[in-house]
Amino acid sequence: MALLGAQLVITLIMVSVIQKLSPHFSLAKWILCSTGLSRYLHPTDDELRKLSGVPREKVKGKKDKRNGHHQANGERSTTFHIPRSLDIRLDTIPIAPYDIVHLRFYTEYQWLVDFSLYSAIVYATSEIYHFFYPLKEEINLSMVWCLLVVFFAFKLLASLTVQYFKSEESIGERSTCIVTGLAYLLIAMIILIVPEHTLEVGLDKAYHSFNTSASSFLEGQGLNSSGPASKIVVKFFIAVSCGILGALFTFPGLRMARMHWDSLKFCKDRLWLKLVLNVSFAMPFLLVILWIKPLARDYLTARVFSGMSSPILSTEAFETIRLGAVVIAVILRFLLMPIYLQAYLNLAHDRVEEQKKEAGRITNVELQKKISSIFYYLCVVTLQYVAPILMCLFFALMYKTLGEYTWSGVLKQSLPLDECSADLEYEKALLATMANERAAVEAHEFQSITPEGEQLPVEDNILTTAQSFQLSLQSLKSVFTKDVYRGLFGFATWWSCFIWFAASSLGMVYQSYFTKS
């Protein structure tokens, strides 16, 4: 309990809230059913017959000798051809809760969005509590919640991408995923050799810190080791992970670009909404720039402009603004989510309008499938919209907490130059304390040796086990320092924002090219 403290209390309360509240309220359902979204209904067979002048066929049944019933030829009686240029007007109705429960991937979408909301509440509550009562030796369980959100989002994106490899008709999509994955792998390899004074992701510092602390940890356990792995091997596996994540972001980015393109087309008269949409689309690019040191940190925290006695921002203020920008970008995307989803649902109307310009004939079943498939895949599109931004958000939250940053950096002055020496003194004191605890545990174990056949009291065994576990936990925490977390989650946050924008930009180029052609 001492290792968890208030974290366990917050987690247990949230688990109880999930159990009591989830049957009555769902943010995922509210987004789809209570934000004004409307779907298009396909015309019925009778309406199509009336518009096209196709007479109703009489069903000729033949007697089934086995059971004596009449069996109709359903395919001939329900399938007929109509002109493609038929003037069809589609009706719209608001999306109701009973309409979406049968949609594909609805359960996965609901779980991801609702669990993300609960995780955000746990994180916010923990941050507020730790602002007044800082962590000492406790485990921050809110990081486990954040990590689970990232895992669920990654798993769902992988599940959606695997669908392209299972279908025999998705050769183009399969090839696109492979090509973009290899392209992102190449880009990641190039980025990983960029020096730290240009792109401040902190991977080199993280590797050095992890290598040093891991070697010390292994030596303390009586194992000789020069380090876990070479830097080139570590960076290669990071690049492979970047390529895989880039492949998973490809079709969500293409879908996002199409929805953005259609949203701009439907809001030509509302310039303020068009401006907000464009700002939201460009926000990931601004986030990418904030990690480029000559364009962001050096310009805002080091350069002194004429007429000023100090830089515009302190180091702490810059870190806070960078983290806040990620949160603002994600919140803005969530606020614009109904507009983007309605732009997707309007594809049914666009398909009918495009079909009116074509010659030839189409069956009623094909027309109805063309219209109804838009709504059928609504939750798939919503997952493609939500999962990438949730990964960016919770990577940034983990980067802030595990990297030991603060949300109030704008209100603080820049720390003095001896900050590093103060941190070094703290680490030395921590190592000395760990050494003393290890010596105490060993002395206690030596004193607890009893003659053969005798047993230690249960209280002594429990105390010794607890002390050994706490010592092992402290040793493990000394391996994963804040520099390791800053490098790992800093790069994960930056790369997620980069491929978020790159995939969307690729989709916009695609839309521009094929629209003009």
Feature roles, as predicted:
Residues 1-46, 83-100, 104-517:
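Alpha-helical transmembrane segments of secretory-pathway, organelle, and plasma-membrane proteins
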Residues 48-90:
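Charge-rich, low-complexity intrinsically disordered and helical linker regions
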